[in-house]
Amino acid sequence: RVCFAIPLPICH
């Protein structure tokens, strides 16, 4: 699982 917070927090 990869999570990013730019610009919104999204996890795949």
UniProtKB/Swiss-Prot annotation:
One annotated GO biological process: defense response to fungus
Coiled coil (residue ranges): none
Origin: domain of life: Eukaryota
Subcellular location: Secreted
Tissues in which the UniProt entry reports expression: Expressed by the skin glands.
Main subcellular location: secreted
Disulphide bridges: 3-11
Annotated GO CC locations: extracellular region
Name of the featured protein: Tigerinin-2
